[in-house]
Amino acid sequence: MASVSKSSIPQKVQSALWARAAGRCQYRGCNTDLVGDLVAGRQDGIFGFIAHIVADVEGGPRGDPIRSTQLARSLENLMLMCARHHKLIDLDAVADHPESVLLTMKAEHEGRIAIVAGIDEDRASHVIRFGASICDNEALVSTQAIFSAMPPDRHPASGQRLDLEMVGCAFRDNEPAYWTVQRENLRRQFEAKVRGRVERQEIRHLSVFALAPQPLLIELGRLLCDIVPAVVHQRHREPASWRWASDGPPITFQVTEPDIGLSGSVALKLGVSATVTDARLQAVLGDEAAIWSLCADQPHNDVLRRADDQAAFRRELRRLYDRIKARHGEGTLLHVFPALPASLAVEVGRVWMPKSDLSLRLYDNNRSHGFIRTFDIP
């Protein structure tokens, strides 16, 4: 194992450091694997350097007249580095890397490795990634962002994702063909990549990461249903992350019912990420539309921060499906107008039960045309 230290670091200390670092550079944001090089054809090659936080000599980087000697062979004073970052902290940018900064980097890296290595097999989860173009923007979900959001509760069952997306679709979401093509692609990919493996018990848990127009997210939820336990992650805007946060107060959900005398189509307004007025629904369905609603008290586009709020939404929606059916009868078509965080749109489909709930007609909010009809479920 390579080391530029002037001290003779005992082999057992070197081995312990490599183990704690999992053979990766401990510089924040690097995480380069320092074992093996496929390009050079050396799978057993070791390319890491052991760096001192407090130099082993007084005149070295972050050196100290007393502590340098005391800490020269201490595991807590050593970091595993790639060549670039070892040179950076000891030669090129010493002033930018004081002892406190390096100690924090070391603690963060080793803490993360300890969490991941400590997760047992029962917490393995297969990752579903689904993205579809929203307006003119492709909704891509990066693998690194996905995998880093899962611990400590879950870890990826493998390094492979179950990708259900269709990137580069030539149709736009204001064209009827877009919804037909995207929905059929999603259904076929789900059948090929997910359902069969669930039935063979190869998949026992799913972690879902999805960004797409809301009707397609609802359709994904319908396909998922309750075939296997799943966690649906939410993409947060500030800070950008897929991890659940604990900041912010709980969301207060408000449920409203239509007047008894209304005789038009039955609608469900879901306003959590934005305010949706009844007038926008009436522009589509007419003034006699019977509008039910489940809305956040203070909707905005980054409102969903807590997993508990997602669970609360599921409970409220489940009760609302039942109440709407009881009021309007078995054969009613329910028109759904969503303005939701992505994960809640998926939950709209997961909560819906095909054998007992009303059929749904899904609408999408189009920037130029308002709410437009997309497709029906089932």
Curated annotation (Swiss-Prot):
A molecular function (GO) term: exonuclease activity
The keyword Cell inner membrane is annotated on this UniProt entry: no
Disulfide bonds: none
GO biological process assignments: defense response to virus
Region (HNH nuclease domain) location: 1-185
Enzyme class label: hydrolase
Regulation: DNase activity is activated upon ligand binding.
NCBIfam families tied to this protein: SAVED (NF033611)
Protein name: CD-NTase-associated protein 5
Source species: Bradyrhizobium diazoefficiens (strain JCM 10833 / BCRC 13528 / IAM 13628 / NBRC 14792 / USDA 110)
Gene that this polypeptide is encoded by: cap5
